Amino acid sequence: MPKDIERSAIRKLTLHIVPLMILLYFLAFLDRNNMAYAAKALEDNLGLTASAFGFASGIFFIGYFLFEIPSNAGTIKFGPRIWFARILISWGIFATLLGFVRTPLELYICRFMLGVCEAGFFPSVVYYFTVFFPEKYRTKILGMFIIVQPLSNAVGSPISGFILNIQHDWFGFAPWQLLFILEGLPPIVIGLLIPFLIKNSPKDVGYLNVEEKAWLMSNAGRSKSGSKITLSDFLKGIKNKKYLLYALLNFGMVCGIYGFGTWLPSTISAISGGDIFRVSLLALIPYGLAALLVYPWSLWASKTKKLGVFAGLSMVIAAIGLMGAVTFFKYDPFVALSFLCIAAIGIYTAVPPFLSMPANISTGAAAAAGLAVVSCIGNIGGFVAPYAVGVLNDLTGSSAPGLFFLASCLLATGLICIFYCAKQREGVINS
């Protein structure tokens, strides 16, 4: 009987919660990464260099870094229903305003504010999952959720390419402006609906029966009824050294993720040539392959309980893919693109097992704060990598040094994960 209750509760939660969270995360990555496809248009219309483009891409994460922990405190204070709505509406506004910028400074301001508004979204979603799902289900749920990272690029790349390939203005807007406006409006609409679509705790959910609610309140990590969250609990999470170590490792992984995502369209264009729509179709291939493999890889990692080893191995594979792409960059476009596919698979399959480790360190407000530390410090890599690659591109006139930089970050982080986590019984960093 308890097993039947458990299965029924998890099935209902998975059907009701996960698709909506996947949609929200899809929109986040769409608005975060669509600028990569507008690089040439922004260069022509705003006079951006590669360094300036990298800076504009990366400054998003400065805003994200500065406001991540305060935003997580907002999730605790106001509850996910209200705070998710605030995040979605505000980020949608600034994502849309990107279509109206006229100078590099306006672009920098809008990208910075987009980061400020979106800050705390991912840790808040992880926190929300832990409220509803017991620990043993979280890696699988995160695996389903994080498929969205490559999937949003796989789906978003041809959409962005199609919009940018429009040959004339619509309603007075150039194609690059339409890209930001059309992809910025949906979060605003969904943000207005969010308070009616989600609840803050299993006990408030109408589609669960009494037995299912009772089981979840007893087994889900962060939904103890009647417990009051204090500031001291929150500060414990920030001071936890395990979270700080994971944050540093996350920095290296994020350098790979956002450095790769920001510069992939430009790299493919340099390798293969062609218009932006052709480039966007080629970009679909590595992202699509990564999306197919993220979930089975996360299931395998969860089954073996060697999360850190699996995450580290993925990062090493990604580094090999990037170095292979550099090696064949000028000699064989097909082989270079194949190595970029390997890099994408490695980068994105690393994410679910890696993020499942800090999610299981503690509970309550301490966990929310700790996850925010991991995310916000790690996301500094989202500024460093795109900007560094842009600077290297300007200095050398080649994409190769930038790709080697990303490969080095991933290789070092992956080897540290494997070295430390292989020693631990559960395959995670415990000391």
What spans do the regions from the language model cover?
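Extracytoplasmic
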Residues: 16-50, 66, 71, 156-160, ...
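Extracytoplasmic gate region of multi-pass secondary transporters
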Residues: 35-37, 233, 237-298, 351, ...
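Helix-breaking motifs and short loop linkers at transmembrane-helix boundaries and internal kinks
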Residues: 47, 79, 100-106, 117, ...
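Conserved MFS/SLC helix-loop-helix module at the cytosolic interface between two early adjacent transmembrane helices
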Residues: 66-105
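Helix-to-loop junctions at the C-terminal end of transmembrane segments
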Residues: 67-80, 292-306, 393
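Cytoplasmic helix-loop-helix junction between adjacent transmembrane helices
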Residues: 110-147
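Glycine-rich segments within core transmembrane alpha-helices of 12-TM secondary carriers
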Residues: 139-164, 186-187, 375-385
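C-terminal transmembrane helical hairpin of 12-TM major facilitator-type secondary transporters
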Residues: 307-357
